[in-house]
């Protein structure tokens, strides 16, 4: 879980992560499915024009508990969270999870996704399916 926590807000590379853990990609995907089904992590899919094949796209990983994520990442002070190298990703994690919770608390599973631009700068462009906006 520490290696996953260190990758919040980043696209998951299953090959790299499974290699670092010394397990197969299949086992890694099983573990991530368990973490997602127990609501410890949220896997945000890449935006697809047709909405199909969401399971086979790149996903960004977010922790539903930012305190647990901070602990697993070794952030022991508020200064580390505010000024640390990953403070922007921790804030992104917080925003995504708050949006997710706002839908789920109303009993709605939102169709959220991220848009990956083809430019050189990586930035989060967040998509919300319009039919869920109230």
Which sequence ranges carry the predicted segments?
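Accessory nucleic acid-recognition modules appended to NTPase machines
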Residues: 1-133
């Amino acid at each position: 879980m520490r290696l996953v926590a260190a990758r919040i807000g980043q696209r998951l590379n299953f090959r790299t992560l499974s290699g670092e853990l010394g397990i197969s990609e299949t086992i890694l995907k099983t573990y991530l499915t368990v973490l997602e089904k127990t609501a410890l992590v949220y896997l945000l899919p890449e935006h697809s024009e047709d909405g199909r094949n969401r399971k086979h796209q790149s996903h960004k990983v977010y922790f539903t508990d930012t305190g647990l994520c901070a602990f697993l990442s070794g952030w022991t002070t508020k200064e580390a969270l505010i000024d640390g190298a990953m403070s922007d990703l921790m804030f992104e994690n917080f925003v995504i999870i708050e949006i997710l919770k706002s839908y789920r608390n109303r009993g709605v599973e939102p169709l959220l996704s991220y848009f990956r631009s083809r430019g050189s700068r990586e930035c989060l462009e967040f998509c919300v399916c319009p039919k869920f906006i109230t």
